[in-house]
Each structure stands twice: as C-alpha cells, then as structure tokens.
Amino acid sequence: MRKSAAPKRPVVQDPVYKSELVTQLVNKILIGGKKSTAERIVYGALEICREKTGTDPVGTLEKALGNVRPDLEVRSRRVGGATYQVPVDVRPERANTLALRWLVTFTRQRRENTMIERLANELLDAANGLGASVKRREDTHKMAEANRAFAHYRW
C-alpha cells in the first residue's frame, strides 16, 4: 500500500474551448491512444450542440454534467458476516468522474449512426434531464435512499 495518497495531477485546458471539462471528456472518449480521433468526436459533438441550441456548448456540457452528477452512492461494507450497502456522500471530484463515465458509457450504447451524433444527443438529453445517464443517477440515488437504514455503518 502507498505511504501517502498519490498527488492529483493538474488537468490541462483544451486548446479550443479553454475548459478542463472538455479535456476530461476527450480523455474518457479516448480508445487505444487515438487522441486526435477522440478530440474530433468531442469537438464535433459540441459543434452540433451549438447548432441545435444556439448557446455556448461548454455551458450545455456543464448543465448535462450537473444533471448526471450523483450526490449519494452505496458502498459495500461487511459487518459480522453480512454485507450491507451503505449510502455515502460522493466527493465532488468523484461525482464529476462518475458523471463523465456514465455519459460516455451510455453514449456508446445509443443507436445513432456516428459517435459524434450519439455524444451530441446524449449531451442534449442529459442537459434537458432526459437520457440513460440521468436515469443512472436517479437509480443510484434510489438505491442510496432504499438503504438509508444502514447509514449508521458509514465510515
């Protein structure tokens, strides 16, 4: 085990939108080290968002992430031979990571033709409080609410 926590590395802002969130999204989309492909997908999707909404695409991304970010999650805790699902608060950084992960996961499951269209539509759905990634957040919250009785096992 480590002696101390690994230091957090700074996130570089992306060159087009000057946003750390966009950089994180590019890195989540990334497969097989093909960063230029990932950037093309993200920038293309943000451009579609700009055309459809007529507003700043980074604002749309932030709104979408705000609707997907979980406040609570359940973590397994073993107590005397039984495993309980204990609801815990989610740290802001982890909430962001989970939101991005869910967005990308459900983007890949969509049925549109190109990845650019899928990402754009998932972002727009999430910004409007719709879509599979928002449902995932609600399911996570429901699970935490259902297991509130075990909240005293929190650590």
UniProtKB/Swiss-Prot annotation:
GO terms for molecular function: rRNA binding; structural constituent of ribosome; tRNA binding. GO terms for cellular component: small ribosomal subunit. One of the primary rRNA binding proteins, it binds directly to 16S rRNA where it nucleates assembly of the head domain of the 30S subunit. Is located at the subunit interface close to the decoding center, probably blocks exit of the E-site tRNA. GO terms for biological process: translation. Keywords: Ribonucleoprotein, Ribosomal protein, RNA-binding, rRNA-binding, tRNA-binding. This is Small ribosomal subunit protein uS7. PROSITE patterns: RIBOSOMAL_S7. Part of the 30S ribosomal subunit. Contacts proteins S9 and S11. Belongs to the universal ribosomal protein uS7 family. The keyword Transmembrane helix does not apply. It comes from the Bacteria. Signal peptide: none annotated.
